[in-house]
Each structure stands twice: as structure tokens, then as C-alpha cells.
């Protein structure tokens, strides 16, 4: 449970509440949306956990997609995680850090330049090797959970529930209806993203049949409760309209009840959380690229490791990619694009649950999804419904996301075809 909380909590809960309040407006709808997101995550984690326990190989969603749908779909899952799910999220976190640094400097300086400087700093940290970056992560992970609990507790203790007053409960966001839901859900799903990493523990858990539901659902529900408490704390000090105008709701909420100095302390504490969250991207992404290269799905140069154990070429590539995306300075656009692609790919991966049930019925499954087939079917139906709403309400963004998915699929088809041809030539040569 603690692992799930540590993985998931990060930039999302600090940067997105204002965006979500702006799209939804009503405090009860805001809380309902966060609750809905937590339920979807809990169900998704259980579906993925069955595949993770049955296929205990390194690679995560790439492995599940490859076994269910073949090498090309495995390529899509792996490269979409590398370029989009982790690359775009890393850029969004760098932009958020830049926004908060700009707050601390009195709104001086360029967000784009701050974001670039952040990426350069992380690049040099990770050239020092795995030990230095891991120690950094261990310290900041412990801090961020304490900070989130402290912010929620302070807001709940000192606030007067101003956001729930009758005068504001009838407010509606500027993007009401399906579009408002779609825009808000993209931000909420970004805040919960990381749940799929928690599911990877399935292969390492003793007695997965009894332990996994408690670990995975318990962890997801713990994150959901923390997020709901944070939002209640924010709404105790600010109206939805005040939240909507804020890039750092936590600071403004604490400042409203404790004063500006306390708000500045929250900015510094929030920076620690964001730095910890971005460190996960720089820590994991080069190793995702390394893993893809080991399977012949990425350039061989990515598999070269330096004396410190760092896949240096992969680190160069990832750092450059995140820095280029961060130069956009557009936090919300980055996460909207990221989640449109991620939800599409995750739908495909989760559908692999039923494909594996049919194609490999005798596969040993240490953990089986409770409520089969109804609960997994409901989970996938929710994803398909959400995806349909995203496409319907944001067709231009969906076209861009579709173009990227199509490009990755084409590259995957070419790569796997070449690999098949090379294997055939080797066989004939013998």
C-alpha cells in the first residue's frame, strides 16, 4: 500500500486542482470526479495485476501487450510509455517546477528557461549514477507524503468550508457538460497515473491471491482518500472560483488561513514533492529505453552502460526529449496530450486481459481478477466510454494523439518485420 502511495502522489495533486475546479465549478462535482478517478484506478490495477502475476517479466505493459496482441502492439506499449506517458509527464513536471521557481523569484524570469534549467540539472544528477539518484529519491519520497498530509490537515483544521457555502454550490465551470468532464478527467487521471507501476509488484508478492487485492485496492483507495482530503482542505479555504485562478492551490489555501509566510513554506515544500516526482522520470526512463533495446525494439546504442551503471546514451536521448517538450511551457496541454495517448494505449493493454484468458487458458495465474468477467468488462467499458468522450469533445487533440500512435505503430511494424526477416535469414543460413 505504501509503495502505491509513494509512486502515485506527485505533481498531479499540486498542480491540477485549480485546472479541475475551473472546468467543473461545483465543489461536490469536483469531489465526485476525484472519487470516480480513484474507482477507475482501483479496478484498472486489479485487471493489470492478473497479467503481471501471470507474466512476471521485466517490461510492464510492453510484456502484457506483446503476449496478448503480438510484437507490434508490444512496441506501441513500450514506446508510448517512453515518449508520451513518461516523456510528456516529465516535461509537465519540469514546467510545474519552473512555475513554482518563478513564484519564489517574484514572478521574474521565463518559465521556459527555468524548465530547461531544471532538465539540465536533472541530467547532470543522473550522470553521477544510480546510487546518487536513488538516495535522492528515497529522501524526497518520505518528505512528500508528510507534506501532503500536513497540507491536508492544516487546511481541514483551520478552514471554514468557504468553498461549500450555498452561494457557490450552484456555480458552473466555464466548460460545463461533456467537454468540462473530459478536460477535468485528463487532469485527474494524470494525478493518479503511476498506478500501473504498482501493479508490477504482482510477480513479487507472496500469496498473491489473498494479498494483492488488499495491496492494490488498498493503495489506490489510500491515494483517493488523500486526494479527497486535499480537495476538501482546499475548498475549506477557497471557493471553486478562487481555486480556478490558481496555479498552486495548496499555497493559496494555506496562505488564506495562515498568512503569506505559510504560503511560501508550502511553495518550498511543494517544490520538494515535484523534484521527487520528476526524479522518478529521469531514474526510470533511460532504463525503459535500455530494456527496449535489449529486446531489439530500440537502437542498440541505448543498451550501452557506463562505469556507473547508467545507460548513458539512453539518458542523453531522454533528457533531450523531456527538455524539448518542456520548452513549450504549456503544462495543461502536455498532460492533456499525454493522457489522451495513455488512455488509448491502456485500453488496448487492458483488453489484453480477455485475449489472454481466451488464447492462454492454461497459463498459471497466481492472482485472478475478482468478479470475472463482470468487473473487468466494466473497467474496459469505462475506458472505452472515456476515450469516446475525449475524442468527441477534443477532436483536434485526438487527431494529434492518433497521429503519434499511428507513427509508433508504423515504426513497430517495420521494426518487428525486420526482426522477423533477420531471424528467418539466420535460420536458413544454418
For each predicted feature, which ranges?
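Transmembrane helix-loop junctions in multi-pass membrane proteins
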Residues: 13-19, 93, 125-131, 161, ...
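Helix-loop-helix junctions that connect adjacent transmembrane segments
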Residues: 27, 31, 108-110, 138-267
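Membrane-interface "cap" regions at the ends of multi-pass membrane proteins
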Residues: 1-18, 22-28, 41-46, 57-58, ...
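Hydrophobic alpha-helical segments of multi-pass membrane transport proteins
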Residues: 148-151, 338-365, 383, 404-423
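C-terminal membrane-solvent junction of multi-pass transporters and transport-like membrane proteins
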Residues: 301-312, 346-397, 429-430
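Hydrophobic transmembrane alpha-helices that form the core helical bundles
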Residues: 19-22, 41-119, 123-127, 270-291, ...
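Membrane-interface loop-to-helix entry segments
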Residues: 98, 111-161, 216-220, 338-348, ...
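TM-loop-TM module centered on a large, flexible mid-protein loop between adjacent transmembrane helices
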Residues: 63-64, 70, 102-106, 171, ...
Amino acid at each position: 500500500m505504501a509503495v502505491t502511495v509513494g509512486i502515485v502522489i506527485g505533481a498531479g495533486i499540486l498542480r491540477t486542482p485549480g485546472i479541475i475546479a475551473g472546468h467543473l465549478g461545483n465543489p461536490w462535482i469536483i469531489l465526485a470526479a476525484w472519487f470516480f478517478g480513484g474507482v477507475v484506478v482501483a479496478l484498472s490495477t486489479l485487471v493489470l495485476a492478473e497479467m503481471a502475476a501471470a507474466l512476471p517479466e521485466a517490461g510492464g505493459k510492453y510484456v502484457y501487450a506483446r503476449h496478448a496482441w503480438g510484437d507490434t502492439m508490444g512496441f506501441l506499449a513500450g514506446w508510448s510509455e517512453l515518449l508520451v506517458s513518461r516523456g510528456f509527464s516529465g516535461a509537465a513536471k519540469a514546467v510545474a517546477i519552473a512555475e513554482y521557481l518563478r513564484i519564489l523569484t517574484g514572478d521574474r524570469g521565463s518559465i521556459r528557461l527555468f524548465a530547461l534549467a531544471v532538465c539540465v540539472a536533472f541530467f547532470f544528477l543522473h550522470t553521477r549514477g544510480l546510487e546518487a539518484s536513488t538516495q535522492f529519491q528515497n529522501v524526497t519520497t518520505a518528505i512528500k507524503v508528510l507534506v501532503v498530509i500536513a497540507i491536508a490537515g492544516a487546511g481541514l483544521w483551520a478552514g471554514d468550508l468557504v468553498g461549500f457555502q450555498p452561494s457557490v454550490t450552484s456555480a458552473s465551470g466555464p466548460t460545463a457538460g461533456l467537454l468540462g468532464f473530459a478536460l477535468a478527467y485528463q487532469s485527474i487521471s494524470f494525478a493518479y497515473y503511476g498506478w500501473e507501476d504498482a501493479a508490477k509488484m504482482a510477480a513479487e508478492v507472496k500469496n498473491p491471491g489473498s494479498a494483492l487485492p488488499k495491496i492494490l485496492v488498498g493503495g489506490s483507495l489510500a491515494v483517493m482518500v488523500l486526494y479527497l482530503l486535499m480537495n476538501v482542505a482546499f475548498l475549506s479555504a477557497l471557493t471553486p472560483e478562487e481555486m480556478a485562478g490558481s496555479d498552486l492551490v495548496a499555497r493559496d489555501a494555506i496562505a488564506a488561513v495562515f498568512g503569506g509566510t505559510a504560503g511560501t513554506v508550502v511553495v518550498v515544500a511543494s517544490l520538494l514533492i515535484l523534484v521527487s516526482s520528476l526524479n522518478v522520470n529521469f531514474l526510470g526512463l533511460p532504463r525503459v529505453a535500455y530494456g527496449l533495446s535489449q529486446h531489439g525494439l530500440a537502437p542498440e546504442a541505448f543498451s550501452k552502460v557506463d562505469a556507473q551503471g547508467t545507460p548513458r546514451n539512453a539518458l542523453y536521448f531522454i533528457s533531450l526529449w523531456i527538455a524539448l517538450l518542456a520548452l513549450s511551457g504549456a503544462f495543461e496541454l502536455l498532460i492533456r496530450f499525454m493522457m489522451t495517448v495513455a488512455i488509448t494505449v491502456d485500453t488496448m493493454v487492458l483488453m489484453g486481459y480477455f485475449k489472454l484468458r481466451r488464447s492462454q487458458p492454461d497459463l498459471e495465474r497466481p492472482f485472478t481478477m475478482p468478479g470475472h468477467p463482470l468487473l473487468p468488462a466494466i473497467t474496459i467499458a469505462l475506458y472505452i466510454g472515456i476515450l469516446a468522450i475525449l475524442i468527441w469533445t477534443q477532436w483536434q487533440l485526438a487527431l494529434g494523439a492518433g497521429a503519434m500512435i499511428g507513427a509508433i505503430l508504423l515504426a513497430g511494424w517495420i521494426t518487428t518485420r525486420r526482426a522477423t526477416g533477420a531471424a528467418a535469414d539466420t535460420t536458413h543460413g544454418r
